[in-house]
């Protein structure tokens, strides 16, 4: 008198079928979650590319706005008539003011002229375009032919300089 119920094969098959359906539903849910995650990643990638492109395109926006007064000043100078010594003096003063505006705009962008310091030749900051024999110490900057510039800690352009060298007899 064993009262244990044995499941019939059809009941087992129904249970297995229900379990298969359950697993299929779970697999479909995981697949949909996976596809959604892939779409999110693709959207994130596209958004990042757009931000990088915008940053590249508009990075100089602030700098360009700083240069507009310089352009205005130059246009004003070109539009004014130049007659006589007084006009030339005013034009020179206007050019000096424009150069000051320009230097301020460059400074706000982190661009600065290379300072000569103690006048020693530095191959990282200077490009020697002439060597001149002198009685003094060798490898000294004698003249700057074109200013060099740095942007923060990066060299934009080296200074073009003449450098001293020892006389031939002393070599």
Swiss-Prot record:
According to its UniProt entry, this protein's organism is: Acidithiobacillus ferrooxidans (strain ATCC 23270 / DSM 14882 / CIP 104768 / NCIMB 8455)
Disulfide topology: none
Under the heading SUPFAM superfamilies, the entry gives:
Coiled-coil domain of nucleotide exchange factor GrpE, Head domain of nucleotide exchange factor GrpE
Sorted alphabetically, the Gene Ontology cellular component annotations on this record are: cytosol
Q: What is its main location?
A: cytoplasm
UniProt-recorded name of the protein:
Protein GrpE
> Where located?
Cytoplasm
What are the record keywords, sorted?
Chaperone, Cytoplasm, Stress response
Q: Which gene encodes it?
A: grpE
**Similarity remark:** Belongs to the GrpE family.
């Amino acid at each position: 008198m064993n009262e244990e119920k044995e499941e019939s094969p059809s009941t087992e098959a129904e249970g297995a079928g229900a379990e298969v359906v359950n697993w299929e539903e779970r697999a479909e849910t995981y697949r949909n979650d996976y596809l959604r995650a892939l779409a999110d990643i693709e959207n994130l990638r596209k958004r990042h590319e757009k931000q990088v492109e915008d940053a590249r395109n508009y990075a100089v926006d602030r700098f360009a706005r700083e240069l507009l007064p310089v352009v205005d000043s130059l246009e004003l100078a070109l539009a004014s008539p130049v007659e006589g010594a007084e006009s030339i003096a005013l034009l020179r003063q206007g050019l000096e003011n424009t150069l000051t505006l320009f230097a301020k705009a460059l400074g706000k962008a982190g661009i600065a002229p290379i300072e000569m310091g103690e006048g020693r030749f530095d191959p990282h900051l200077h490009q020697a375009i002439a060597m001149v024999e002198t009685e003094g110490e060798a490898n000294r900057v004698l003249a700057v032919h074109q200013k060099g510039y740095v942007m923060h800690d990066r060299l934009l352009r080296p200074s073009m300089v003449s450098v001293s060298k020892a006389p031939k007899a002393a070599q």
